[in-house]
A protein has these predicted regions:
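Key DNA-contact positions within bacterial/archaeal DNA-binding proteins
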Residues: 32-35, 42, 61
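Short, basic-rich loop-to-helix N-cap that marks the start of a DNA-contacting helix
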Residues: 17, 40-54
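A short, Lys/Arg-rich alpha-helix, primarily the initiator
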Residues: 1-18, 22, 59-65, 80
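The DNA-recognition helices of helix-turn-helix-type DNA-binding domains
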Residues: 30, 41, 67-71
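Short alpha-helical DNA-recognition segment
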Residues: 15-36
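Key DNA-contacting residues within the recognition helix of helix-turn-helix
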Residues: 35-36, 50, 64
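Short, charged recognition helix plus adjacent turn
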Residues: 65-93
Length: 93
């Protein structure tokens, strides 16, 4: 499962931008939001997961599942979302 930092770095690479500022402009996500993601203060919501996934040319469901697993507050929810992410990785839509 990828960290949000790995996701942001991949989105920057795919979009061929060097800074989070440029990525924020490309995605239409506030620079302060991207900064909060990178610093580990919050994880992106579903709408911003969709934008990030589109920037990486990936299935948004996978990124949503990965972020939900990371924000899960119980072991059961973490296991559920991790399992969904794993299945989406093995059997992409």
């Amino acid at each position: 499962m990828r960290s949000i930092i790995e996701v942001l770095d991949r989105a920057k690479a795919v979009q061929k931008v060097r800074s989070d500022y440029k990525l924020s402009l490309t995605l239409g996500i506030g620079e302060s939001s991207l900064s909060s993601y990178r610093r580990g203060l919050v994880l992106p919501d579903e709408i911003n997961c969709i934008k990030l996934a589109a920037a990486m040319h990936e299935d948004p469901a996978l990124l949503v599942a990965e972020m939900q697993a990371q924000r899960a507050k119980t072991p059961e929810l973490k296991k559920l979302w991790s399992g969904i992410a794993k299945r989406l990785t093995l059997h992409p839509c």
